[in-house]
A protein has these predicted regions:
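Catalytic histidine neighborhood in serine/cysteine hydrolases
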Residues: 202, 206-223
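Conserved alpha/beta-hydrolase "acid-adjacent" motif
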Residues: 196-201
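Short beta-strand/loop motif that positions the catalytic acidic residue
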Residues: 183, 189-191
Length: 255
């Protein structure tokens, strides 16, 4: 089922799938990138959860609005979505920009956050491999086509969103590793072993979170969820549905 919800001036498109505990999927960022990115993952998650797939401002079926696109604004939109559409706390599974949004929501509104999965996301923009956010890099042509297929703003607005997101990615986010200590939700950090997010940054994210687990998916890139969907789906579902095991030789988790 597809619908729209007005969130403080942003007419936000979303779909709902499945039954169970609420889970909000937060898609990657980029003009031409939207909830369609979760095609290989949606079925496995909707088999266990009530899945919501909102599309953020300037992405997919949700129109752009005046002013810059910022992580702060997208986090506010997501909090409003949780309050008004979901109606309470949910698991958050975010990929790339969606992971950063999920992290900000977890920091600001722990009352609306159950477990969190951060897939290939950053807490500071220096966590990207430099070529990943080089504003001089032209996006692949297919993204313009994907944008034009669904955007209410039309294909002519595509360069505007490209420019807004390029500016955002070189300046945001700006959290420090010690800020992550304020996250109270149990969190899974996932990254590809050849990701646009550096392994060092993924490890810093894991170490900064007080209750975290880390997965490095072998043989994958920034597109790990679509490159190895069966493996990634299984890891995510297990994390969201099971309690931590008592490990035999804990170091970080030693009490």
């Amino acid at each position: 089922m597809a619908d729209y919800e007005e969130l403080d001036g942003v007419r936000t498109w979303y779909q709902e799938h499945g039954d169970g505990e609420a889970l909000v999927l937060l898609h990657p960022g980029g003009a031409g990138v939207d909830a369609r990115a979760f095609g290989p993952n949606l079925g496995a998650l909707a088999a266990r959860f009530h899945v919501y797939t909102p599309e953020r401002r300037g992405h997919g079926h949700t129109a752009d609005v005046e002013g810059p696109i910022t992580f702060d604004a997208m986090a506010r939109d997501t909090i409003a979505f949780l309050e008004r559409v979901v109606g309470g706390p949910a698991h958050l599974v975010g990929c790339s920009d969606g992971a950063t949004v999920a992290l900000l929501v977890a920091l600001r509104r722990p009352d609306l956050t159950r477990r969190v999965v951060l897939v290939a996301g950053v807490f500071h923009h220096d966590g990207w491999v430099p070529t990943a956010i080089d504003p001089d890099n032209e996006p692949p042509e297919r993204f313009a086509r994907l944008y034009g297929e669904v955007s209410p703003d039309g294909i002519q607005h595509y360069p505007v969103v490209v420019a807004k997101l390029a500016q955002m990615h070189t300046q945001e986010p700006t959290l420090a590793a010690n800020d992550l200590n304020e996250v109270t939700s149990r969190t899974l950090v996932m990254v590809g072993d050849d990701d646009e997010v550096t392994l060092e940054h993924a490890i810093a994210t894991y170490r900064g979170l007080p209750d975290a687990e880390l997965t490095v998916v072998p043989g994958t890139s920034h597109g790990l969820l679509v490159e190895k969907p069966t493996l990634c789906n299984g890891i995510i579902v297990e994390f969201l549905t099971t309690d931590p095991v008592a490990t035999m030789a804990p170091i970080r988790r030693a009490t």
